[in-house]
Amino acid sequence: MRLRRGSTALLSGALLLAGAALPATTGAAATAGTTALVSCAGVPAWAEGVTWTAGSKATYAGRLYQALQTNTPPVGAGWTPPATPALWTDLGACDGGGTPSPTPTTSTPSPTPSPTRSPSPTPSPTPTSSPSPTPTSSPGGTTCPLKPRPSGKVLQGYWENWDGAANGVHPGLGWIPITDPRIPGHGYNVVTAAFPVIRSDGTVLWEDGMDAGVKVPTPAEMCQAKAAGLTVLLSIGGAAAGIDLGSSAVADRFVATVVPILKRYNFDGIDIDIETGLTGSGNINQLSTSQANLIRIIDGVLAQMPAGFGLTMAPETAYVTGGSVTYGSIWGAYLPIVKRYVDNGRLWWLNMQYYNGSMYGCAGDSYAAGTVQGFVAQTNCLNTGLVVQGTTIRVPYDRQVPGLPAQSGAGGGYMGPSLVGQAWNTYQGGLKGLMTWSINWDGSKGWTFGDNVRALQGR
């Protein structure tokens, strides 16, 4: 994920620089309607492919922005400051000074898992057709049983529903069908399909056409992939495929249209990779409107799916361990939601994105992405329990599946096979597994991530 996206998502190959996040600034972010002018003299224009450290400023479309997290917007991804509020805060309209902003190049980006934070990644394109979002039957009536939570170690990868080779993002391998035998052949046993289109009213569409030749798997193909050993989840969100969490009507429409897709296509679970629009109230014991509506969505989906239907989450670090720095706005916004579903047993595992931003320990300590030290501090914090305003949020090791970039270029904070091995072996098999953005990125550079993790897991 993840911005993956995501993840959630496509990021440039440069490692993100270490930098402390600026939570206080986040809470005071200016809105697009701000009328006071600010000086932009000497401030560089925002550009893709440049690493912006936390706290740095840039101008874009006549406005001044400040980076909330260190980030490197990938070329062609469309991660402009106004499109990525998890990464930038708007300080106001420029008074006339500053450098004109370049026009972002256009290509189909990859999210997470975005990886944002992932900063998650894949804008939702305007569908070329408008099929019914609630089909009532599968071609040929093909169905297959729901798979339970995997009992052993997992290697979870995001499957891209677009062509990353055709758009030049990872030329070595573009779109592949979900039934491609190389996926399980290189160690992946959980696949997260990214991402459906979400319309402004909450309607969810799972359809062909993200790029020429790209097709979503049929129900029969989903069953074929599952028979080959895969557990398959549908990922919701990413950096740009957001949902209006301020509206309960939108939340209800989302549930009403995603449940038929989950059933028709034989998905085993849902992955929550919401990277925009979720904020905390400042009081961890009082849900904000957006938090309440995300819970409304999750509960609505789980209530209509069979018992044992899976739930995973792939938030960026700011939304989870960032709560050790401060609680409010995006900082720690996932914490009440994670706690709810860990405590009630419904969360299969947490896929926090250990990339595209700082990693945090329980004391507000900050570490650069891509370091074993940061990986360990953050993982231990969740297992021990992060205490925020007297409330403890604990995610035990066996419910942690940390997310890492599959290859250099897939996300900031890439860890090579040796560092991944050091991080994994710290826990002597105690972690449930690892997640990566993305399967397609891994395949584009020889599948080294999957092969390494499979060996580490002894599979």
Predicted regions and their residues:
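Tryptophan-rich substrate-binding surfaces of secreted polymer-degrading and adhesive proteins
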Residues: 3-9, 24-136
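Bacterial N-terminal signal peptides
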Residues: 11-21
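Chitinase-like catalytic core of GlcNAc-active glycosidases
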Residues: 144-382, 397-417, 428-431, 444-456
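Short mixed-charge
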Residues: 384-394
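Feature captures outer-membrane beta-barrel proteins of Gram-negative bacteria and organelles
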Residues: 423-424
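Residues that scaffold, gate, or flank divalent-cation-dependent active/transport sites
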Residues: 438
